[in-house]
C-alpha cells in the first residue's frame, strides 16, 4: 500500500440530497445553459458505442479560438480536478514542499499528500515571505480565490522565483476575465493554468477541464495522459458552448448583476465581495441561517472550518437571492 495515504484526509462532501425540489447554492455551479444549446448537444449525441476522438482536435480548435492560445499549448481533461492532478503528479516528488494560501480549494490536498509532499498554508499577504523561507517546489493558487473571491497577480512572483512552479486554478475566471493569465502561461518556464467548464459555462455535469503551460511541461503531462478521458458528451458540449459563448456570457453577466444586488441588500452585514459567482457571509448565527435555508430547500455551504461563522452562497436567480437576503435580515 502507498504509505502516504495514511496521511490523506478525505475530501468532505457537503450534505447534498439530489431532488428537483432543492435549490443548490452550495457547490458554485454556473447557471444552466440555454435550451437551444442543450438541443444542439442532444442532436449530436449519435455515436456512443465508440470511444471519443482521443485527439480532441475540434474541442482544442474551439479553445484556441476562445482563448487566443495555440492549441499545442492546451490539453483537455475529465474536469479541472483531473488537470490539477496531472500537474501535481508531473511536478512533485516525495518530500517536496507545496505552499497554498489559506483558505483555498482543498481537493488538491489529497493529491499532494498522496505523493508524500508537505503542505504549508499561509495568508495570501505573506505568500512571498513564505516562498523565501519555505522554498516550496510548487505554489498553488485559485484565482479568483475559493472561498474568499479575491484575485492575485501571480506573474511577478513567477518571474522573481524561477525555481518555484506556480499552478493557478482559474475555475472562476469567466466572472472576472481581467484576472486571467491563461494567455501568458506558455511563455513562462514555471507556470501552469487550469480552467473548467463547470462554473461560468454552467456545464458541471459533463466534467470538462483544460490547462495550458509551456511545451516542456506539456510534453511531460502528455507522456502520462490518458487521452480517452474526455467523453463524447463532454467534447460535444464543450464545442457547442464555445461556439455560442455569447449566450454563456449573457448568463455570466446576469450572475454578476445578481451578485451586486445581493451584496447591496446586505450592505449592513459582513459580506465579502467576490470576483466569482459566490459570496462569503460572516454571521454569528451562520449555522442557524444555514439550517433555516436547508429547511426551505435551499442549500448553501458552511465554511466555518475556514473562517469561523461563515457561509459561502452561490449566486442563484434574482428571486432566490432576494428570498435568501430577506431570511438573513431576520437574524
Model-inferred region functions:
Residues 1-50, 65, 135, 164:
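N-terminal "arm"/small-domain region of PLP-dependent enzymes with the aminotransferase-like
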Residues 4-6, 90-142:
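PLP-dependent aminotransferase-like
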Residues 34, 55, 115, 190-265, ...:
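PLP-dependent aminotransferase class I/II
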Residues 36, 285-291, 320-323:
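Short, conserved charged micro-motifs
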Residues 56-57, 71-95, 209:
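Conserved beta-loop-alpha segment that forms the PLP phosphate-binding cup at the N-terminus of a helix
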Residues 124-176:
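Active-site phosphate-binding strand-loop segment of PLP-dependent enzymes
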Residues 155, 295-296, 305-331:
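PLP-dependent enzyme catalytic core of the Aspartate aminotransferase-like
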Residues 256, 268-296, 315:
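Conserved PLP-binding catalytic core of the aspartate aminotransferase-like
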Amino acid at each position: 500500500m502507498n504509505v502516504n495515504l495514511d496521511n490523506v484526509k478525505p475530501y468532505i462532501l457537503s450534505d447534498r440530497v439530489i431532488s428537483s425540489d432543492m435549490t443548490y447554492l452550495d457547490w458554485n455551479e454556473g447557471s444552466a445553459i440555454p435550451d437551444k444549446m442543450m438541443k444542439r448537444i442532444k442532436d449530436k449525441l449519435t455515436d456512443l458505442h465508440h470511444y471519443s476522438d482521443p485527439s480532441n482536435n475540434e474541442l482544442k480548435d474551439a479553445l484556441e479560438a476562445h482563448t487566443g492560445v495555440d492549441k499545442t499549448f492546451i490539453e483537455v481533461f475529465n474536469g479541472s480536478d483531473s488537470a490539477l492532478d496531472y500537474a501535481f503528479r508531473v511536478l512533485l516528488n516525495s518530500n517536496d514542499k507545496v505552499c497554498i494560501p489559506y483558505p483555498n480549494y482543498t481537493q488538491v490536498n489529497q493529491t499532494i499528500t498522496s505523493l508524500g509532499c508537505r503542505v504549508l498554508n499561509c495568508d495570501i499577504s505573506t505568500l512571498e515571505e513564505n516562498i523565501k523561507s519555505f522554498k516550496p517546489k510548487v505554489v498553488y493558487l485559485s484565482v479568483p480565490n475559493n472561498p474568499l473571491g479575491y484575485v492575485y497577480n501571480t506573474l511577478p512572483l513567477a518571474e522573481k522565483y524561477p525555481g518555484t512552479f506556480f499552478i493557478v486554478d482559474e475555475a472562476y475566471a469567466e466572472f472576472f476575465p481581467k484576472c486571467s493569465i491563461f494567455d501568458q502561461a506558455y511563455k513562462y518556464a514555471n507556470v501552469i493554468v487550469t480552467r473548467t467548464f463547470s462554473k461560468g459555462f454552467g456545464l458541471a455535469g459533463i466534467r470538462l477541464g483544460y490547462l495550458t503551460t509551456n511545451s516542456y511541461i506539456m510534453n511531460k503531462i502528455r507522456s502520462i495522459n490518458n487521452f480517452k478521458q474526455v467523453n463524447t458528451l463532454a467534447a460535444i458540449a464543450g464545442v457547442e458552448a464555445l461556439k455560442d459563448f455569447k449566450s454563456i456570457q449573457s448568463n455570466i453577466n446576469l450572475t454578476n448583476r445578481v451578485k451586486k444586488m445581493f451584496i447591496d441588500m446586505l450592505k449592513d452585514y459582513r459580506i465579502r465581495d467576490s470576483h466569482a459567482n459566490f459570496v462569503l457571509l460572516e454571521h454569528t448565527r451562520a449555522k442557524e441561517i444555514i439550517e433555516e435555508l436547508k429547511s426551505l430547500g435551499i442549500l448553501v455551504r458552511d465554511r466555518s472550518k475556514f473562517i469561523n461563522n461563515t457561509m459561502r452562497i452561490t449566486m442563484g436567480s434574482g428571486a432566490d437571492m432576494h428570498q435568501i437576503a430577506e431570511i438573513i435580515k431576520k437574524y
